Structures are given as C-alpha cells and as structure tokens.
Amino acid sequence: METANIYRLNRDRPAASPAAPTAKPTSSPQKPKLLDQVRQAIRTRHYSYMTEKAYVGWIKRFIFFHNKRHPAEMGEAEIAQFLSALAQEKHVSASTQNQALNALLFLYHEVLGKEIGYINGVVRAKRPIRLPVVLTRQEVRSILGCLDSSDWLMVMLLYGAGLRLMECLRLRVKDIDFGANQILVRAGKGDKDRHTMLPAAVKEPLAKHLELIRRHHQRDLERGLGRVALPNALERKYPNVGKEWGWQWVFPATSHYIDKVTGERRRHHLHESVLQKAVKEAVRKAGIFKPASPHTFRNVST
C-alpha cells in the first residue's frame, strides 16, 4: 500500500532533532457584519447619527422583505420590488421612498462596491400637493406667548432669522456673533454655509440663555464630561477642542449619550421632536386651528 511505502521510507531516514514548537497561525480578524460595515462607512463620511439610523433601518427592512437574502445576491430587480411595495402597500410619501432608495444605493456603492444601474419598473410614491400653512402676525404672537424659555428662543430664531429647524438645533456658541448681529449657519441646505441676521429681540434673552448653558457646561467639565461631537476630521486633529466653550451647542440636550465609537459620554443638541411637540402644544393653547409646525414660522419670516 502507498501508506506503508511512505512509512518505510520515513523509517530509513535519520532521526531528526526535535523541531522547535511553531507558533499557531494567527487567524485573520473576522470581517465585520454587514450592518456594522454600513455604520462604519457612514461614520467615516461624517454623516449625522440621524442618517445612520435611517439608512441602517432601511437596509434591515430591505433584507427582511426579501426573506433575509444577502444584498450581495440581489440587485436592481429586488430594489425595484422593495421600493414599489413601499408605495403600494405601505403608502409612504415620496420623500420617504427616496430616502429608502438613497440608503440602498449607499449600501451597494459604498459598502458592497457594486454598481447599480437604472432601476426599472418602480411604482413611485405620489407627491402630495399641499399649500403652505401661513400664520398671521397676531397668531405668531399668540403662539409665542404660550412657549417657555428655550422653546421661545428657538421659535424666535426660526421666525426672525429664517432658520430651518435643524439649522437652529445645530447652532454652536461660536456661531453667534453678538457684535456683528450675525448668525453663522453651518452646512445648511445644499451643505453650504451662510450668514443671517441675529434678531435684536433675541439678543438679550439669548445672552442670558448662553450664560445658563455655560454654567451647565462648567459643571460637566468638573465631572470629567463636557465633550461634544465635532464636524469632519477636527476631533482627530484637535482631540481636546470638543470640550471648548465655543464648540458647545446653543441648545444642548438635557442628558448625555454614549458615543458608539469612543464609548465616551457626550452631550448632543436637542432632538427636533422637543420643539415640534412644544409648538404643537402652544398652537393648541393659543386656540389656533391650523396644522402649524416649527417650519411654519420660517414661512412667516420669508
């Protein structure tokens, strides 16, 4: 037998000295799961946490819609089926359907490295034709009279400075120039920076608000906290800048969160739902029967 021949050949050879124990080959690091790859790709590009949450959510729904098939095995046809089902069965809005599409295109282009061509046969969600809600100046005054402190300040900035809701919430202390009566809006619509005026009516209450926020920030620093997330690559270049007063949020959240990358406790800006709920309640208290939202005040301003 062949095995026996090999055995005899080995016996005829001189005995070899004992070999030094060889190190076990190190196993290559396990490839991250798909959704973790998506999260990492989003964070590398410095997208917002809201975008990360939305994209991961849509990708999960896409996978479950196709009975947990891996996206690498699917393509244009499966994307079209999913998007059409959103319009026909879930009756989502056109903007929601577009967000789902953007999430899937990000998955294929940026994570899987797979080009997606023209997606045929998608049933498009209908764009509702709605007239903008317009408030009279008296209605605005009535609503403002039903708002408290920071909610009042935020609405005044939407109304007087023409800020969008998220532009207001993302304001940093350094963006307010009291001397020049200006506000710097960073990465606004179209990812562009712009200046807008600081309304005279809010200068004094805003200064008092910031003094209160400064005291809260000082207490955070004393507890070893006080860091906020920074845009782009600033955090890598200047590790301690995130604790500086100028980079703090004008409208910070009341609680901290755990940064998923660093594990550090940080403070984010207020969630948009805080002002949305406050405005809804103020409209009700003012006895106004219009579907007004924070964005409505910007329409009045412009």
Positions of the model-derived regions?
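Conserved catalytic core of the tyrosine transesterase superfamily
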Residues: M1-T302
